[in-house]
């Protein structure tokens, strides 16, 4: 109902506005502004001016223009005469006529319009009529003429007319100025009202804008504060634990604590952390007192140390969470799984990549973040089907059965795959090689922060038929893998280290760390007792110790997280690969003197470690750095990632072992590396040589024939067990931690071998000599440790396992025509080979170095 009324009232409003404005505009146009200036003279001759402003109306009988002139009063009767003989005034005057009442006008007389015309004819610039007594004169003037006058005709009445007549009657001299618009005022160009109105409007607009901006900023600030509070609530807090008090159990309770191995003081208040004090761990892994950093985070939203924005990472991970539900756990593992190579302290092992999951992150001693990873083992293949990574897409899954591996130790040995034929562990710059791996590695796995090793790359699939798979036969036992519950992929093996078990109450990590959490960082050797300085009896017990420094049990976990403090041969000037760390093998000698194999050290239980019969101490090596035939040392070449010290000069021979050495394309064997101590059990009646003899020269069985150019061969006993003298090789099963090298090639960064040189004609005498040491012999590395050497060694070699016989088999490594024999021409040293008195099989050797530039 209201809407029609409004629509009907709008035309009326507009009509009223037009009616109000139109007369105003017409009146504004017809208004005549008369300014009268009076001149008064003083006795001294000065003149004073007085200005009087009056208003009148322009009539239609004249023009609407401006006029100015001296005021001349004219009597109305004087304009009634049409006589032209009257005196005429000069042009430029303004005539003022006061009209009388109509009854008083003489007749005949001119009309009002005729009087105006008569005044203009006599020279008036304008005519002003006072119509106060004769209102009908206005109608006469507004009737208009066909030919209006060219000068203005103005009529006045009321107070303005009275003022004008007073000035004319009393003053002798006055001047009038008629304008059709009001005269300009000094304040015309500055109107305070308009200015105030404009100022108020602008001020209101600015105030509204400021209020709007302020409200927007406040809303944004409140939103940021809310986000900061939410991020702070989701941020993890941990309680500080002093060194040695960090729980070792693989539960979520252990993840809520921080050890003192990293920075132990707050960067804000510079106070030391107290045991049990609550710390705030920022997603950038920096930690501070909760009371110190929370106000800063709420106000600035950034880390005080690295300016990391916590709001941007609010949707990221917020600390470890224990997932009890199996489905959630499987989904989380699929999203966070990382396939990484694994590094085990102790000795070299090769296995495929293992899936691991980030558990928590802490800071290392140098400010680098170290992530604790959890190893994934597919214990429930039915619930969690394995997903093949991209680089493992073409590899066949292998089902393993640990029960058929023939292992004899009492450790838990997870199933471990053997690589198929053709799947080699290849290098980036050199040709590949194949390895056949055992399955013995410890339950506690230490994953290192460095994921790739220098010079190594992932394998490439090679099309090899199933008939080309390497045969592993030992003493009639075929170590085949049967089907089991655990499914592992078998890509090319990856370098790993592990710590061997210990049999004497030293806290081996297998017994104390049953959880799956592993630490990233350098865990050098993980020993718990230093047996390097013990007697020969204690040195026979299995442990993995560094020759420079040891760790206690309380520092084992911190060592795994923040790096080993017993860095093997670590120095700022050393030139080794920092990403590949190897400790000594279980067969490393521990004492200062090398006990014989038949000594007290060899009479321990089956778990004891038996040393070689004699070890030669070299002048240029540390007294505690002794090598055995199964020792693994750190690589000192910056270009290498693997280093194998294959053989050591020994004083024993190989009794009851038929030696078959082939030059050229013959089958080669190499003594297996000794792994865990369980594989070193000796059985009575198994005589074998304890040390590997490495010779440079022609085949001892071919001394009568023409000698080839400086070939390198090694005579070892097949699958050597540490046995007492006089026993024979006879363990029915193959050691699980031995590995074989298939299609091996010689590389200058792969092997550092201590050798002996002997003349061909002195081979028989050298074989017969049974000397405990070689005073004149010096250890000569075959390949100089030249970091800048990039050329690959084109040694032709083929290592494989084949059945030589039911009772005995040998292993020969042959390298023909390669730079691995290049130092022979430089040294030309004569060294004798040692042998066992009364040996059934005598090894002779010649040293025929090849002369090369």
Swiss-Prot record:
Keyword Transcription regulation listed: no
This protein's UniProt keywords: Cell membrane, Developmental protein, Membrane, Metal-binding, Signal, Transferase, Transmembrane, Transmembrane helix, Ubl conjugation pathway, Wnt signaling pathway, Zinc, Zinc-finger
Bilayer-crossing regions: 193-213
GO molecular function, one term: zinc ion binding
InterPro entries noted in UniProt: Znf_RING, Znf_RING/FYVE/PHD, ZNRF-3_ecto, ZNRF3_Arkadia_E3_ligases, ZNRF3_Znf_RING
Family statement: Belongs to the ZNRF3 family.
Name of this protein: E3 ubiquitin-protein ligase ZNRF3
């Amino acid at each position: 109902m209201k809407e029609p009324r409004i629509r009907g009232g709008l035309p009326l409003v507009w009509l009223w506005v037009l009616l109000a404005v139109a007369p105003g505009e017409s009146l504004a146009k017809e208004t005549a502004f008369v300014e009268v200036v009076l001149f008064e003279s003083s006795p001294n001759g000065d003149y004073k001016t007085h200005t009087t402003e009056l208003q009148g109306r322009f009539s239609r009988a004249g023009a609407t223009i401006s006029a100015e002139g001296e005021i001349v009063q004219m009597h109305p009767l004087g304009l009634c005469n049409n006589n032209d003989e009257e005196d005429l005034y000069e042009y430029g005057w303004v005539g003022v006529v006061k009209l009388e009442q109509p009854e008083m006008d003489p007749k005949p007389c001119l009309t009002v319009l005729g009087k105006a015309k008569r005044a203009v004819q006599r020279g008036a610039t304008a005519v002003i009529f006072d119509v106060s007594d004769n209102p009908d004169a206005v109608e006469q003037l507004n009737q208009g003429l066909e030919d209006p006058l060219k000068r203005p005709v103005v009529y006045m009445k009321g107070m303005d007319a009275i003022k004008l007549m007073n000035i004319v009657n009393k003053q002798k001299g006055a001047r009038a100025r008629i304008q059709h618009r009001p005269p300009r005022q000094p304040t015309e160009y500055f109107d305070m009202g308009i200015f105030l109105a404009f100022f108020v409007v602008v001020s209101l607009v600015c105030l509204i804008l400021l209020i709007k901006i302020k409200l927007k900023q406040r809303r944004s600030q409140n939103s940021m504060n809310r986000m900061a509070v939410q991020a702070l609530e989701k941020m993890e807090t941990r309680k500080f634990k002093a060194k040695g008090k960090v729980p070792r159990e693989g539960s979520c309770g252990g993840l809520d604590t921080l050890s003192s191995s990293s920075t132990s003081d707050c960067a804000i208040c510079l106070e030391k952390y107290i045991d049990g004090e609550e710390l705030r761990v920022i997603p950038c892994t920096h930690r501070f007192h909760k009371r110190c950093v929370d106000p800063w985070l709420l106000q600035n939203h950034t880390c005080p140390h690295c300016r990391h924005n916590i709001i941007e990472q609010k949707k990221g991970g917020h600390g470890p969470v224990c997932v009890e539900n199996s489905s959630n756990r499987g989904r989380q593992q699929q999203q966070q799984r990382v396939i990484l190579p694994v590094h085990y302290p102790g000795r070299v092992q090769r296995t495929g990549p293992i899936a691991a999951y980030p558990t928590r992150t802490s800071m290392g001693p140098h400010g680098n973040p170290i992530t604790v990873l959890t190893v994934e083992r597919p214990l429930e293949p039915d619930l969690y089907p394995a997903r093949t990574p991209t680089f493992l897409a073409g590899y066949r899954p292998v089902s393993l059965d640990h029960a058929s591996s023939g292992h004899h130790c009492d450790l838990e040995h997870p199933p471990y795959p053997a690589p198929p034929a053709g799947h080699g562990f290849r290098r980036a710059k050199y040709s590949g090689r194949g390895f056949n791996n055992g399955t013995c590695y410890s339950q506690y796995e230490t994953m290192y922060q460095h994921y790739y090793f220098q010079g190594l790359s992932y394998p490439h699939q090679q099309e090899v038929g199933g008939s080309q798979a390497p045969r592993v036969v030992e003493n009639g036992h075929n170590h085949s893998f049967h089907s089991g519950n655990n499914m592992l992929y078998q890509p090319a093996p990856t370098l790993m280290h592990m710590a061997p078990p210990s049999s004497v109450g030293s806290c081996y990590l297998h017994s104390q760390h049953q959880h799956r959490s592993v630490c990233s960082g350098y865990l050098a050797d993980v020993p718990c007792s230093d047996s390097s300085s013990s007697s020969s009896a204690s040195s026979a017990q299995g442990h993995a110790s560094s020759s420079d420094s040891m760790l206690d049990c309380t520092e084992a976990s911190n060592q795994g997280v923040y790096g080993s403090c017993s860095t093997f041969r670590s120095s700022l000037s050393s030139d080794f690969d920092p990403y590949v760390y190897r400790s000594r093998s279980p067969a490393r000698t521990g004492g200062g003197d090398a006990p014989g194999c038949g000594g007290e050290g060899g009479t321990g239980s089956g778990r004891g470690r038996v040393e070689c019969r004699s070890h030669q101490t070299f002048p240029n090596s540390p007294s505690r750095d002794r090598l055995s035939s199964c020792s693994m040392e750190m690589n000192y070449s910056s270009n290498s990632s693997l280093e194998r010290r294959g053989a050591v000069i020994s004083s024993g021979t190989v009794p009851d072992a038929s030696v078959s050495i082939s030059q050229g394309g013959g089958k080669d064997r190499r003594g297996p590396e000794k792994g865990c101590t369980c594989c070193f059990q000796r059985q009575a009646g198994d005589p074998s040589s304890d040390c590997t003899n490495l010779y440079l020269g022609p085949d001892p069985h071919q001394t009568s024939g023409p000698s080839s150019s400086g070939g390198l061969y090694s005579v070892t006993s097949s699958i050597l067990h540490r046995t007492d003298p006089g026993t024979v090789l006879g363990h029915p099963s193959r050691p699980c931690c031995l590995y074989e090298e298939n299609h091996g090639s010689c590389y200058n960064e792969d092997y550092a071998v201590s050798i002996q040189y002997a003349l061909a004609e002195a081979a028989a005498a050298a074989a017969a000599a049974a000397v405990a040491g070689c005073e004149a012999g010096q250890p000569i590395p075959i390949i100089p440790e030249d970091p800048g050497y990039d050329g690959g060694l084109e040694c032709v070699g083929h290592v494989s396992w084949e059945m030589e016989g039911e009772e005995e088999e040998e292993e020969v490594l042959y390298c023909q025509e390669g730079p691995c024999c290049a130092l022979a021409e430089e040294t030309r040293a004569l060294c004798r080979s040692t042998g066992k008195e009364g040996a059934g099989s005598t090894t002779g050797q010649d040293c025929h170095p090849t002369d090369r530039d």
